[in-house]
């Protein structure tokens, strides 16, 4: 991805309220078109398009810290989703870590651990309507929350801590989550995370996640487990997933993935998927086919779905 950078000395004071010699502005973007379909399910027009442009600015303070801000202008398939997303302000304090405030968007650290198995396309349960998925996130619609990151405490160790304050309305209590990742052994990645979501009052959701990924030559294998434990009488879900990817060349990758959702009071949802992706410069072609048994825990409800994608980065 090519990034155009422009020195903007005159705008440094306007971008951040600190003393800085110069600010650096970068603009990146992307666009994609896709087609998806399903068996035993009416999906209507399967064609979709997405695009977005990200504006970022950064400057170095007199004490050596770096301050940056970023925002995404994106357009999805519905007019209600048009606008600015992922607005953030980050203070990088060097060995003391970095603190990011998300005015809108962002991803809680545990949300990125929902299924970490290697794939050339999508997770095994994706592209099938009503299939149970996992995507834990801090409450309040991902607005006005904090994330702290530090990778300097120990070689190969990165920690992330999330805090979402209560808003006195939909979120009566604050929500917290955190993860730790270890990459100190060549090719091996280990991760663990936990969190508490109090944004669904009076119900609370406790989340825990563990994963391991190992890459050797052209092969990458991964295992992931993710559990949601709700204070309600039902609704607990545990995901266990495995995946294997193979880099046929520098440009072509293929993968197979399997996932099982254990749903409290329902049948287990079992998913199996195959994916492939081909990268040619800034263009990526992707394809995947997934089959899901007992969709959403409903016994005998079996469906499959597929997706084709073409994306460009600039």
Residue ranges with predicted function:
Residues 1-314:
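Outer-membrane beta-barrel proteins
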């Amino acid at each position: 991805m090519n990034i155009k950078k422009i020195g903007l000395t005159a705008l440094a004071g306007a971008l951040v309220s600190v003393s800085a010699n110069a600010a650096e502005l970068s603009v990146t973007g992307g666009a994609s078109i896709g087609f998806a379909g399903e068996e035993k399910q009416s999906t209507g027009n399967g064609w979709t398009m997405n695009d977005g442009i990200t504006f970022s600015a950064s400057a170095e303070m007199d004490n050596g810290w770096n301050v940056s801000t970023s925002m995404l202008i994106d357009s999805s398939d519905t007019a209600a989703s048009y606008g600015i997303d992922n607005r953030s302000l980050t203070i990088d304090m060097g060995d003391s870590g970095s603190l990011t405030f998300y005015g809108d968007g962002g991803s809680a650290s545990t949300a990125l651990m929902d299924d970490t198995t290697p794939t050339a396309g999508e997770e095994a349960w994706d592209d099938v309507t009503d299939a149970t998925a996992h995507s834990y996130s801090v409450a309040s619609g991902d607005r006005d929350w904090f994330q702290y990151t530090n990778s300097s405490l120990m070689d190969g160790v990165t920690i992330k801590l999330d805090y979402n304050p209560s808003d006195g309305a939909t979120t009566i209590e604050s929500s917290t989550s955190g993860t730790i990742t270890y990459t100190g052994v060549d090719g091996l990645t280990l991760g663990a995370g936990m969190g508490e979501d109090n944004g669904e009052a009076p119900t609370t959701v406790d989340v825990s996640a563990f994963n391991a990924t190992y890459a050797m030559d052209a092969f990458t294998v991964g295992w992931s487990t993710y559990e949601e434990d709700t204070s309600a009488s039902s609704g607990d879900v545990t995901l266990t997933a495995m995946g294997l990817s193979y880099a046929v060349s520098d440009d072509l990758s293929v993968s197979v993935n399997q996932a099982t959702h254990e749903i409290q009071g329902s049948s287990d949802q079992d998913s199996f998927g195959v994916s492939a992706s081909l990268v040619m410069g800034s263009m990526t072609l992707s394809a995947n086919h997934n089959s899901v048994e007992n969709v959403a825990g409903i016994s005998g409800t079996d469906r499959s779905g597929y997706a084709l994608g073409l994306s460009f980065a600039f």
